[in-house]
Design a protein with these regions (language model features):
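Residues that recognize and position ribonucleotide moieties
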Residues: 22, 130, 192
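PLP-dependent aminotransferase-like
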Residues: 89-178, 185
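Short glycine/proline- and charge-enriched loop/turn segments
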Residues: 11-15, 118, 192-193
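Conserved PLP-binding active-site segment in aminotransferase class I/II-type PLP enzymes
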Residues: 1-81, 85-89, 168
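Active-site phosphate/pyrophosphate- and oxyanion-stabilizing loops and adjacent acidic/basic residues
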Residues: 63, 161, 189
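Structured loop/turn residues at beta-strand edges in well-structured enzyme cores
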Residues: 69, 94, 143, 193-196
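Conserved active-site segment immediately N-terminal to the catalytic lysine
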Residues: 176, 180-196
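Structural motif
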Residues: 66, 91, 139-140, 189-193
Length: 196
């Protein structure tokens, strides 16, 4: 191999530095402390209705998140994995459906599709963003492709314009995984509000 690795003085592939930012401030720490100190982590009362869907702090958080980012609804879940499971189920993935996903992500990107009997298909990444490369997405599409799971990484968004131009005309659903880029905007629109 003639080229040297970047770590050994060779030319780096990536030219844009990763964002290095603090993700939790005083308000978030105070809110979490308030809930923990109340000893009421959920409104669940073992009764029918929406009581299981979190306590008043959870409801307030969901409402403020939806308002802040322009979503019609915001529903909190216990983990990133659970969020992907809900999203993949919501778009109707069935056994044999192909779901294009990132090879550079937590395993839940692929296993959420597998849970519903879907087949994960890995597309290549854009070397600048480490998000899915739209050209590679297009190359991976078959008649069985039903969804694309876009993982926004390192506080930066994927190329959503190109991805939506590929997906929409074909009726392919786009699921945005924003766990590693919360509160990020793409061309003045909150990520998570662009796909399906």
């Amino acid at each position: 191999m003639a080229e040297r690795l970047a770590i050994l003085g060779g030319q780096p592939i990536r030219t844009i530095p990763f964002l290095n930012r603090k993700t939790m401030g005083t308000n978030e720490i105070e809110a979490a402390t308030r809930v923990i100190n109340s000893e009421i982590l959920s409104g669940f009362l073992a009764a029918p209705g929406s009581f299981f869907n979190g306590g008043k702090e959870v409801k307030a958080f969901e409402k403020s998140w939806a308002e802040k980012y322009g979503f019609k609804h915001a529903i909190s879940v216990n983990s990133w994995t659970s969020g992907l499971m809900v999203a993949v189920g919501a778009v109707g993935i069935k056994p044999g459906d192909e779901v294009i996903c990132s090879p550079y992500s937590m395993s839940a990107s692929a296993t959420a599709a597998l849970f519903y009997g879907g087949i994960p298909v890995f597309a290549d990444l854009d070397p600048e963003t480490f998000c899915l490369d739209p050209k590679s997405i297009e190359e991976k599409i078959t008649s069985k492709t039903k969804a694309i799971i876009v993982v926004h990484l390192f506080g930066g968004p994927a190329d959503m314009d190109s991805i939506m131009k590929i997906a929409k005309p074909r009726g392919i659903k786009v699921i945005e995984d924003c766990a590693q880029a919360p509160g990020v905007f793409y061309k003045n629109k909150a990520i998570g509000a662009i796909g399906d």
